[in-house]
């Protein structure tokens, strides 16, 4: 069996891992059982990007949510009736926390009676098997996979399977949702589910869609890598009218949505995570008239703050473009800090909707040059120089960053030199190579003769050899030259004597040999 906790830790971002650890700590301190469930587990197993973390608690999660809010989490929407909380966790992580429940229908299509339950009942009441999987985060069963409807097998077969034949009758919004899953994951409907889907379309259940459910589905488009694929699926099944009756005729702005998806990819490569809810809503409704778009947002029960953001999107973007064109952002430092204060989704919208050359050039410099410089500031190098952390430390880093924006201090050698200057640390003197001592009193090419005085030797008892050693240098040179000449002459004399000896005739024999010869 796969180690799902290891899989989680390796697939989650650092921010998501921090949320996971914090939620587990709170569940232990509050003595409640908690599970990672739904889309996070589905995406984990299928290899899709993990967009959000959905947690299910056996009990009421409100205490846990309040503790998370103290640590920086923000609640976007909550329902006491459903015990459901849509949250942006600390670290800008999307997710939700909900209490385990069961939905009981008296008859198909009726409003369900909500009963709070355990995790297994909660998984069985869900829409599709691929969403009915959970991983235990509890101490004694940590990493245990819960899959009561065999959703893992459907993930392997790349199929979306409804859990009951009344799935679309009970909640017609699932017609839009299943098309979104198929478009996102490139899955097909399981054969019986396809039959139930076709029957629901034949009964025109899709024409009764509306309200907050449709609003939630349109919001979900902003999390899709390719929202156009989902919108075209909805269009082919005559579901765009659920957003507004005139949308099938006018159609969403597909070209701008495709550009927006590409720009989002560039922003994410730069380490930014844009929330495209407002731009995606704007382009989905963009070809409707203003009053039609406003009516559509009201019918989808969008929050007043969301409607205001969509209405003011263009004006806000125009102001940013004017600032980027003006003197306010002429200097690279000023442009950097200005753009760092702008929401990433606004940068994406400007690149798509208002491609002013000067503004776009600064945005791209921010993403591709300035921001990487900022993230790579040499804090460790300044630590190594012995500068203590504090106001002075931060000031030096900021001054270095400003110089780097101007093109200075980008290579290691010059960067260290600048850091030393800014910190007031003198450079270490360079070590000079050792040089040979000059030979005193010696001509070039002559061997050095060292004088070593014998221990205990006095001038009165100096031997001739010692006296010669103590003679002046000029006398030594002359003596050495004379000795060399004498040696050379002696050698020549010896050679001449040997030659003469070879040339001399043999001597006459003496004694009896001589007398006998005379006879």
Q: What residues fall within each predicted segment?
A:
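Catalytic cores of the polymerase beta-like nucleotidyltransferase superfamily
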Residues: 1-519
């Amino acid at each position: 069996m796969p180690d799902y906790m290891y899989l989680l830790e390796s697939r989650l971002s650092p921010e998501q891992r921090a949320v996971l650890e914090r939620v587990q700590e709170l569940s232990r301190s509050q003595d409640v059982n908690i599970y990672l469930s739904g889309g996070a587990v589905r995406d984990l197993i299928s290899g899709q990007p993990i967009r959000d973390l959905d947690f299910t608690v056996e009990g009421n999660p409100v205490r846990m949510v309040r503790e998370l809010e103290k640590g920086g989490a923000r609640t976007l929407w909550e329902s006491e009736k459903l015990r459901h909380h849509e949250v942006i966790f600390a670290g800008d992580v999307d997710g939700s926390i909900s209490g385990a429940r069961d939905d009981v229908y008296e008859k198909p299509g009726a409003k369900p009676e909500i009963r709070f339950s355990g995790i297994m009942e909660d998984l069985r009441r869900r829409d599709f098997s691929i969403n009915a999987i959970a991983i235990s985060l509890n101490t004694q069963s940590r990493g245990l996979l819960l899959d009561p409807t065999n959703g893992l097998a459907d993930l392997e077969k790349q199929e979306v399977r409804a859990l009951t034949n009344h799935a679309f009758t009970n909640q017609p919004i699932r017609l839009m949702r299943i098309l979104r899953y198929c478009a996102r994951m490139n899955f097909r409907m399981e054969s019986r589910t396809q039959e139930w889907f076709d029957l629901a379309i034949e009964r025109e259940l899709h024409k009764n869609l509306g309200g907050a459910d449709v609003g939630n589905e349109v919001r979900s488009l902003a999390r899709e890598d390719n929202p156009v694929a989902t919108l075209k699926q909805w269009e082919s099944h005559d579901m765009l009218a659920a957003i507004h009756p005139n949308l099938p005729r006018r159609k969403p702005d597909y070209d701008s949505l495709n550009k927006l998806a590409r720009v989002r990819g560039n922003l994410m490569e730069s380490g930014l995570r844009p929330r495209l809810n407002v731009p995606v809503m704007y382009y989905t409704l963009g070809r409707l008239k203003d009053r039609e778009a406003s009516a559509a947002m009201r019918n989808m029960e969008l929050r007043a703050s969301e409607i205001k953001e969509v209405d003011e999107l263009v004006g806000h973007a125009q102001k940013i473009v004017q600032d980027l064109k003006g003197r306010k952002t002429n200097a690279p430092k000023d442009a950097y800090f200005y753009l760092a204060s702008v929401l990433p989704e606004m940068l994406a919208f400007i690149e798509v909707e208002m491609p002013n050359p000067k503004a776009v050039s600064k945005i791209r410099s921010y993403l591709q040059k300035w921001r990487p410089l900022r993230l790579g500031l040499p804090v460790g190098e300044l630590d190594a120089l012995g500068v203590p952390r504090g106001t002075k430390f931060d000031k030096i880093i900021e001054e270095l960053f400003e110089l780097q924006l101007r093109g200075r201090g980008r290579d290691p050698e010059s960067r260290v030199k600048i850091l030393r200057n800014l910190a007031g640390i003198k450079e270490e003197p360079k070590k000079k190579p050792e040089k040979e001592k000059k030979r005193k009193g010696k001509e070039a090419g002559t061997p050095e003769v060292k004088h070593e005085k014998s221990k205990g030797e006095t001038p009165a008892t100096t031997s001739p050899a010692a006296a010669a050693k103590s003679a002046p240098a000029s006398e030594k040179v002359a003596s050495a030259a004379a000795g060399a000449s004498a040696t050379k002459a002696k050698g020549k004399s010896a050679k001449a004597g040997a030659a003469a000896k070879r040339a001399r005739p043999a001597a006459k024999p003496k004694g009896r040999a001589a007398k006998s010869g005379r006879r």
